[in-house]
Structure formats: C-alpha cells, structure tokens
Regions:
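Aromatic- and histidine-enriched alpha-helix N-cap/loop-to-helix transition segments
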Residues: 76-82, 117, 158-164
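Penicillin-recognizing serine hydrolase domain
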Residues: 28-61, 65-66, 122-243
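Bacterial N-terminal signal peptides
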Residues: 11-19
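Bacterial N-terminal signal peptides that target proteins for export
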Residues: 1-9
Length: 243
C-alpha cells in the first residue's frame, strides 16, 4: 500500500477537475462528495486523529475541508515554508538583502538550498538568524489565524506545527504576488516524482515536503499548491500512518 500522502493530491485532483466552479471565492463548506471521499480514504488507510491531519482549499470555488487540523504534529521540514516566506517578505520590504550572509552562505543561496534541496544546516542558520527559538516561533505566528490561546505550548518548545497553520501559510503564499515568484519556482523544482508529485504528473506542484524518522516515530508530510485549472492548496501531516 502506498503512503497516503503520496495518493492524496491525485485523489483530490480527480474531484477538482469535474467540480463546476462557484461564482464566489469566499470559503465554502466541504461538499458531500468531498466529505464522503475523505471518509472513505481515511477508512481505507486506517487514518485517525492520532496519525493524520489534513487541510484542503480550492482557490476558485472557496471549498475548504479540514480534518484534525489543529492537532500539533511533528512538522519535519515543512517548517521551512513560513521561514523562507518571511525572509522573502523582508527582502521585498528592503529590510534585508539577498546578498546578506546567513551562516556560511548568502540569503539567495540559502533560499535555494532550503527550498529545493531541503538543506537542514542552512535552514537552521536561517532560523537562528532571527534570534532564539522562541523569537523565531513568535515571528512565524503572524501568518496564522489561530488565536494565541489555542496554540499548544509544544509549538514553542519544538518543531511542531498544525495543518491549519500550514494552510494559512499557503494562502498567504498563493495570494502574495511577485515577491514570492522565486520561492514558488524553487518549490516547483523540489523532489520531482515524490510526495504529492508521485501520481500528479500533468500539473505543476509547488510543495514543501517533510520527512522525519527518530525515536520510533515516522512523520511523512507535504504542503503545497497544485496548479490545476482550479488550483488547490493542500497540507497533510502524518505520524506513523499505515502505508
């Protein structure tokens, strides 16, 4: 059985291609078709609130589906999504230069290494260039709609995020205009034929994936923009999920 992260983009692609666009783009509740599709998918893979979290958003119809989206889980390398986005915004505002040294390399190269190759050492240098770990986590919160009182303390202590936060980040990225063109291009280059890209070959995908194995825990995650005729945003976290 293939891991669920690798099948989800293709599964939702099929639904998106035959959905008739709505006139408005405000957030809409999930259709009965989408809800049933996701229920069947979870049952097939043995997915539950202990091992699976998902957020889906259709940028054309506004349809949104969430499952277990506020559960904080090991983010693996998906933390690099809001981290890089923040630096691109600082560059656009003239607050930092792409030639600024981040550790042993320039910020321009750090973006490439972090987003295309998911270089951990470079990304950690980017993180601590902002200050200590708490400062970095507080800085990232500007992209999230989750109220402070709902954010679990583990968020501040370790590399934990939730898919609700990742969906907020993807929305900001998708709607952010020219300042994110390079970032999206790098995300399109990353990991061809893997994660969301395994079964979706006819449409571009800009994604930031994450893979973590340690202490008996395996996290396989992906977050991205799938550029179908109705582009959709997808964030999926797993923890020891079957497949």
């Amino acid at each position: 059985m293939k891991h669920p992260v690798r099948r989800l983009a293709a599964l939702l692609l099929g639904l998106t291609l035959w959905t008739v666009p709505a006139a408005a783009v405000e957030t809409q509740p999930a259709s009965e078709d989408l809800t049933a599709l996701m229920e069947d998918f979870r049952a097939e893979y043995g997915l539950n609130e202990g091992n699976f979290s998902l957020c889906y958003y259709n940028t054309v119809t506004g349809e949104e589906y969430r499952y277990n989206d506020t559960k904080f889980m090991i983010a693996a390398s998906t933390y690099k999504l809001p981290l890089n986005m923040y630096y691109y915004e600082m560059e656009a505002a003239g607050e930092i230069s792409s030639a600024t040294m981040i550790g042993a390399t320039t910020l321009a190269d750090a973006h490439y290494q972090s987003l295309v190759w998911s270089n951990n050492d470079v990304s950690i240098d980017m993180l601590y260039n902002l200050g200590n770990f708490r400062t970095y986590k507080n800085t990232m919160k500007q992209y999230f709609t989750m109220p402070d009182e709902e954010i679990d303390s583990i968020y501040y202590a370790d590399n934990y995020y939730c898919t609700s936060m990742m969906l907020d980040t993807l929305k900001h990225l998708y709607e952010g205009g020219d300042k994110f063109d390079e970032m999206i291009d790098y995300m399109k280059q990353a990991q061809p034929g893997e994660y969301f890209k395994l079964y979706v070959t006819d449409y571009e995908i800009a994604h930031k994936y994450g893979y973590y194995v340690d202490d008996g825990v395996t996290a396989i995650n992906d977050t991205g923009i799938i550029y179908t005729p109705q582009p959709f945003l997808l964030a999926v976290y797993t923890s020891d999920a079957p497949g």
